A protein has these predicted regions:
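C-terminal accessory nucleic-acid interaction domains of nucleic acid-metabolism proteins
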Residues: 1-29, 35, 46, 50-51, ...
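Short secondary-structure junctions
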Residues: 47-49, 158-164, 205, 361-367
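Polyanion/phosphate-binding surface patch
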Residues: 51-84
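Short beta-strand
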Residues: 56-59, 165-171, 211-215
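Signature for HUH/AEP ssDNA processing cores
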Residues: 97-170, 181-189, 325-328
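A short linear hydrophobic-aromatic micro-motif
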Residues: 162-167, 208-210, 368-373
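A short beta-strand motif that forms the metal-chelation/ATP-contact edge
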Residues: 176-182, 221-225, 383-389
Length: 435
């Protein structure tokens, strides 16, 4: 079995190390299969992720193993791999990969980057997004038909303000609607425009959709406006997703949403669909629209008493935003929440939930799917998993008290280790002689 295979891509040689390494155990698909997939749909993938800075999301052990986010481009890279320097809200900066051609996609696949995670800006203007992203994220227990209904209302709102929405499956359980916009507005303005969409959709169908940021307050389909904040990325069109069946994020027409099944779009099936239909988002760049009408809607919402909505925790507090929780104290929840556990591996955190259910079977019998809150917590190098339970549907006399976490893995140790290494680097290697 070859330890390396070389792909010739438009005159460039791309090496795939360990090409037969299985990345998807359920389907048996390998790293070489991943590289060949991205070559088969390269033009469509570059329409979504090309010419933009990309975060590398790497799965060296495949789906089910540990994965990590890599913002900084590897130092060892071909000279034809381009990078651009980004400044983040945290104050840090990093040089990120800018794929320009099919060879770059194959090179990223060799790093076991299953997903394509581009920023909504072009490399030649990092301050003005040209893409507005409406992320429809269903809470547990919500299925495709309800997502489909909400997407139709999103389309209606966009149509009314003169914008063209381009739908695609998320590659997981939800849907994305991307909108090409003129490069005239800041990240904050684009986020405010999407928040206006979310609130208008929620107003029209309050039982189906929500714009509530806190998980325990959500129902139905959450419209995640914060995916438009600076430093946030979303899987782009044709991106493979880390699901057991190797699903991909599939561009759709509005007409086929009614009858399609997101599970039908996979690493194995998408190349044939692409060869038959081409890129359904190929005309997106011809429909760059204006945010003026959405920002006017946002101003009317604000006049009606709707100020800004919560930002991701690591962002600086914004004017008009409600008070945030100080880092030294907990936010006072509106619902009876208890935390079950947190772990590096999602499976370990969910195993702790099953142990909790076994200990508290009477309470567990009253839980609804949306009462199980599984949070991804961004660590220094990877995403950790926290599991909480909302006891709102459990009779008060049956509600368990907060117990010691199980499992109780401390994600802050990861940051502490980085700080310790930095401190050691700053310490002189030789002690100063005493005077």
């Amino acid at each position: 079995m070859s330890e390396q295979e070389t792909l010739e891509v438009a005159g460039r040689a791309v090496s795939v190390s360990n090409p037969h390494k299985v990345l998807f155990p359920q389907t048996g698909q390998t790293k070489l299969d991943l590289a060949r997939y991205y070559l088969a749909i390269a033009e469509g993938a570059l329409q979504g992720a090309g010419h933009r800075p990309n975060v590398l999301v790497r799965y060296p052990d495949g789906v089910g193993g540990e994965f990590f986010y890599q913002k900084r481009a590897p130092r060892s890279r071909p000279e034809w791999i381009e990078v651009v320097s980004l400044q983040f809200p945290s104050g840090r900066s990093a040089e990120e990969i800018v794929p320009r051609d099919a060879a770059a996609l194959a090179w990223m696949a060799n790093l076991a980057c299953l997903e394509l995670h581009p920023h909504p800006v072009r490399a030649d203007d990092l301050d003005h997004p040209d893409e507005l992203r409406v992320d429809l994220d269903p809470v547990p227990g919500v299925d495709w038909p309800q997502i489909r209904e909400v997407s139709a209302i999103v389309k209606a709102v966009l149509d009314e303000v003169g914008l063209t929405g381009w739908p695609k499956t998320s590659g997981s359980r939800g849907m994305h609607v991307f909108v090409r916009i003129q490069r005239r507005w800041t990240f904050d303005q684009v986020r405010r425009a999407v928040l206006a969409v979310a609130r208008e959709v929620e107003r029209r169908t309050p039982t189906l959709a929500t714009s509530k940021w806190w998980k325990e307050e959500r129902h139905g389909v959450f419209i995640d406006y914060n995916q438009n904040a600076k430093d946030r990325t979303v899987a782009s069109a044709y991106s493979v997703r880390p699901t057991a069946d190797a699903r991909v994020s599939a561009p759709l027409t509005w007409e086929e949403i009614a009858d399609c099944n997101p599970a039908d779009f996979t690493l194995a099936t998408m190349p044939a669909r692409y060869a038959r239909l081409g890129d359904l988002h190929r005309d997106m760049d011809r429909h760059a629209g204006s945010l003026d009408a959405l920002l006017e809607l946002s101003a009317r919402q604000q006049a009606d008493g709707l100020g800004d909505a919560p930002w991701p925790p690591h962002y600086r507090k914004q004017p008009g935003e409600a008070s945030r929780v100080a880092p030294s104290r907990r936010r006072m929840p509106k619902h009876p929440l208890i935390e079950i556990g947190r772990a590096r591996e999602k499976a370990d955190a969910l195993a702790g939930l099953e142990r909790w259910k076994a200990r508290h079977s009477a309470a567990a019998a009253h839980l609804e799917p949306a009462d199980i809150l599984v949070d991804g917590l961004r660590g220094r190098f990877r995403t950790w998993t926290r599991v909480r339970v909302n006891l709102q549907h459990v009779p008060p006399e049956l509600r368990p008290v907060q117990e010691p976490l199980d499992p109780d893995e401390n994600m802050h140790d990861e940051w502490r280790a980085v700080s310790d290494r930095s401190a050691r680097r700053r310490t002189p290697s030789r002690a100063r002689k005493a005077p």
